[in-house]
Amino acid sequence: MSEKRRYFGTDGVRGKVGQYPITPDFVLKLGWAAGRVLAKQGTKKVIIGKDTRISGYMLESALEAGLAAAGLQATFTGPMPTPAVAYLTQTFRAEAGIVISASHNPYYDNGIKFFSSEGTKLSDEIELAIEAELDKDIECVESSELGKAVRLNDAAGRYIEFCKSTFPHKMTLAGMKIVVDCAHGATYHIAPAVFKELGAEVVAIGVEPNGTNINHEVGATDVRALQAKVVEEKAALGLGFDGDGDRIIMVDELGNKVDGDQIAYIIARDALRRGELKGGVVGTLMTNLGMENGLKQLGIPFVRAAVGDRYVMEQLLAKGWKIGAENSGHVILLDKVTTGDAIVAALQVLASVVDSEMTLNELSQGMTLYPQVLENVRFSGDSNPLEAEAVKAAVIEVETELGEKGRVLLRKSGTEPLLRVMVEGEDAELVQSSALKIADAVKANC
């Protein structure tokens, strides 16, 4: 739709806790507004999960109050990965799923994102309808119609069994040592159990959430601890999840990082080998040229979507394809799940490792990653770095120097005043200096 959303960003409503809109009063009203819209859809039942941020308790209570005022029943799962909430929303035939999380962001941020009854992101139409309700004063339903809350005590067990069901039944992980880094986030009590029950020897780190340590120097956004542990333990590989369990970054037996592009490449190549690949692969504007070239050599079609898993999903649905990914670790496998699921994606790579009797490092060799540098540059909230003449001039200079063997991409964050500067090319030193040149232009002028 052409109408602009005021509160919903690319991944729900997100911000710093205690600052609008992530305040108890706004979240209560958001719960009521969502409840008003969803109550018209059908069952009046909503699944609510969260990650391990301390603010999750406060926001959970506010959401529940708002939903109850609109006459909806809330079912709490406790700390649960985002894809688990999508799965449970489907299996419980709920009208919607709600996740309280800011994904890979620091603990002092939080957010609210919604899933439809099919376990997919809400449509623009529904989000706009919720925003329209936010402009109204809260009106409670009749006392006899108020919603109530219940707790789902076996949510973790249900999701663990689902994850295991996506791994080939005749395979086992016996004899494989795996380091699992849960980022002190929502997978902390899920991921180790999944891999352990499939037979692996699991060394778990990032599994001691205290409310403020989520994503701090651990997990998919900072794999240094995971790399060190894999080498120290002489493990077969490492799995790094982000705070809400929808991103996966892997580490091979040598301690090398294996990102979302490489993970999708391995999964697609394996599906092609088995004759089960349906169509091609959807990446994003950030996808490494090496992945595109590697897939091309295999004869696998590839297209780029705008950055963001919702846009990858749009392309997948439009083309009828099943595999999509972002290099940040969102991997969507529509033949198994309805949204990015880090544990399920990891299991598909592990199946390839077991079946091929190759190491993760060997499986990653099929594609050559171009050196790629990403600089995150903060700017003044009221400026637009994409329109700054000095920034434009720096980009032109860099593009001229890189020629046809590289590319530049500037992208504003959908959730904060941050410009992502990506430079890619064959020469690592040139790529690094080029990214810094553009970043410096942003800092000096915006």
Swiss-Prot record:
Enzyme Commission identifier(s): 5.4.2.10
Pfam families found in the cross-reference section: PGM_PMM_I, PGM_PMM_II, PGM_PMM_III, PGM_PMM_IV
Record's protein name: Phosphoglucosamine mutase
Cofactor: Mg(2+)
Organism: Vibrio atlanticus (strain LGP32)
PROSITE patterns the record matches: PGM_PMM
Keyword Metal-binding: yes
PTM section of the record: Activated by phosphorylation.
Biological role stated in the UniProt entry: Catalyzes the conversion of glucosamine-6-phosphate to glucosamine-1-phosphate.
Catalytic activity field: alpha-D-glucosamine 1-phosphate = D-glucosamine 6-phosphate
Record's keyword terms, sorted: Isomerase, Magnesium, Metal-binding, Phosphoprotein
Residues noted as binding Mg(2+) in the record, renumbered to the chain: S103, D242, D244, D246
Gene Ontology annotations for the cellular component aspect, listed alphabetically: cytosol
Family stated for the protein in its record: Belongs to the phosphohexose mutase family.
One of the protein's GO biological processes: UDP-N-acetylglucosamine biosynthetic process
Keyword Transmembrane: no
InterPro entries: A-D-PHexomutase_a/b/a-I (IPR005844), A-D-PHexomutase_a/b/a-I/II/III (IPR016055), A-D-PHexomutase_a/b/a-II (IPR005845), A-D-PHexomutase_a/b/a-III (IPR005846), A-D-PHexomutase_C (IPR005843), A-D-PHexomutase_C_sf (IPR036900), A-D-PHexomutase_CS (IPR016066), Alpha-D-phosphohexomutase_SF (IPR005841)
Cofactor note: Binds 1 Mg(2+) ion per subunit.
PTM annotation (Phosphoserine): residues: S103
GO molecular function: magnesium ion binding; phosphoglucosamine mutase activity; phosphomannomutase activity
Origin: domain of life: Bacteria
Active site: S103 (phosphoserine intermediate)
